Amino acid sequence: GRERMKDFIDYAHSKNVDVFLWYSSSGYWNDIVQGPTNYMDNPIIRKKEMKWLHNIGVKGIKVDFFGGDKQETMRLYEAILSDADDNGLMVIFHGCTLPRGWERMYPNYVGSEAVLASENLIFQQHFCDEEAFNACLHPFIRNTIGCMEFGGTFLNKRLNRNNDGGNIRKTTDVFQLATAVLFQNPIQNFALAPNNLTDAPQVCLDFMKQVPTTWDETRFIE
């Protein structure tokens, strides 16, 4: 819980791990129940929360569930980025609009989902069946616009945390590892499950530890 978050962050740092925390964008337009809610839409509460996050050593935030592209929401994106920058926090947007040059305006902007991302593989088998086909399109369509926070690289064949049920992955481990290079985003959030740390081939884990997330240039190969 919130009262133990500082202990959690300290433990992560002892393992040389930095932490991003998830938030809902909230607001009167947003009726989701997943919390924490009502922290990001109110300027006073948001600034106080971000100061607290900085003080306990959080590296960044992932803000989710934005309500369309109306002017008020577009202003909210930039307000979150600006306040986060003031507090040394990086920002990932999820459930959001396409990025619009924010990487040139805010040095703490990491990336945006704005794509039918990896979570859909868990929702429906259809997305697993089409994963390889869609992966051939993303670099030439969505990812040309800006950083794409796909959150992929599944190593379980069955897409639940215990690898014993749910949808069936149709792609190989090598394919999954390749998406860490194919899909450009300054931070790659791998879809690891706890059992992967003991069950996955060590070569896969070593690759995920070492693969770069930023590149000097990107070239399309015909």
Feature names for model-found ranges:
Residues 153, 181, 207, 211:
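Residues that form generic nucleotide/phosphate-binding pockets
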Residues 192-222:
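Glycan-recognition and catalytic regions of carbohydrate-active enzymes
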Residues 1-172:
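Aromatic- and carboxylate-enriched substrate-binding clefts and catalytic-loop regions
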Residues 86, 115, 182-184, 188, ...:
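Short, well-ordered loop/turn and helix-capping segments at boundaries between secondary-structure elements
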Residues 1, 20, 186-192:
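Generic hydrophobic/packing signal
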Residues 165-166, 175-191:
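Catalytic domains of carbohydrate-active enzymes that cleave complex glycans
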